[in-house]
């Protein structure tokens, strides 16, 4: 064999040995970890169940609060007034001033929460009960007033409108008088211009 071939064979065997030793170490580590994990999980499982099944209740009773010896115990009347007054002295810790149920009922500044009916908009979408629900409030039912005279004064070309109305009336009379009715009536544009210029 040649020398380069021997070097390649030796390098391949070394790589194969490293791979086998890595696999053996991983397998030993996994079995060791599995044994330790199973023993640890056996020890941890009862504790987990105890934590899940245990429960604690928190109560707020002034009689059972442990206070430092240098602070005097407040009477219930003082506690109810202290919840209204607030944090007056900075010598007392903040957690001593807690609200009792009586304070919420006696507090004049307490505002009841908004009821859910306030936010329901059903009253806006329901039809009104009046029989005249579709009429407008600002419409006066009565004789219709003719606004033709008022409209004539509003426009600058009111004279042209009056001339046009007269011509339309003449055209209608002319059309009715003839046996065959034309689709339209041709009028002389110079006559209209003379009338408009007056």
UniProtKB/Swiss-Prot annotation:
Phosphotyrosine carried by residues: 136, 155, 184
Gene expressing this chain: LAT2
Membrane topology of the entry: Single-pass type III membrane protein
Residue stretches in coiled coil: none
PTM comment, free text: Phosphorylated on tyrosines following cross-linking of BCR; which induces the recruitment of GRB2.
Taxonomic lineage of the native organism: Eukaryota, Metazoa, Chordata, Craniata, Vertebrata
First-listed, main subcellular location of the protein, grouped into a coarse class: membrane
GO biological process, one term: B cell receptor signaling pathway
Compartment list: Cell membrane
Source organism: Gallus gallus (Chicken)
Protein name from the UniProt record: Linker for activation of T-cells family member 2
Residues in compartment: Cytoplasmic: 25-198
């Amino acid at each position: 064999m040649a020398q380069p071939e021997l070097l390649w064979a030796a390098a391949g065997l070394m790589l194969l040995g490293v791979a086998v030793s890595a696999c053996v170490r991983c397998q030993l580590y996994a079995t060791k970890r599995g044994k330790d994990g199973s023993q640890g999980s056996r020890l941890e499982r009862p504790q987990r169940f105890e934590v899940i099944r245990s429960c604690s209740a928190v109560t707020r009773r002034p009689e059972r609060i442990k206070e430092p010896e240098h602070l005097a115990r407040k009477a219930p009347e003082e506690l109810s007034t202290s919840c209204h007054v607030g944090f007056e002295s900075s010598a007392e810790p903040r957690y001593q001033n807690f609200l009792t149920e009586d304070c919420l009922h006696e507090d004049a500044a307490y505002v009841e929460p908004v009821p859910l009916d306030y936010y329901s908009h059903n009253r806006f979408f329901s039809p009104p009960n009046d029989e005249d629900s579709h009429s407008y409030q600002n419409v006066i039912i009565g004789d219709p007033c003719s606004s033709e005279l008022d409209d004539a004064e509003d426009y600058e070309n009111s004279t042209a409108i009056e001339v046009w109305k007269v011509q339309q009336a003449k055209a209608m009379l002319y059309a009715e008088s003839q046996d065959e009715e034309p689709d339209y009536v041709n009028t002389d544009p110079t006559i209209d211009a003379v009338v408009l210029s007056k």
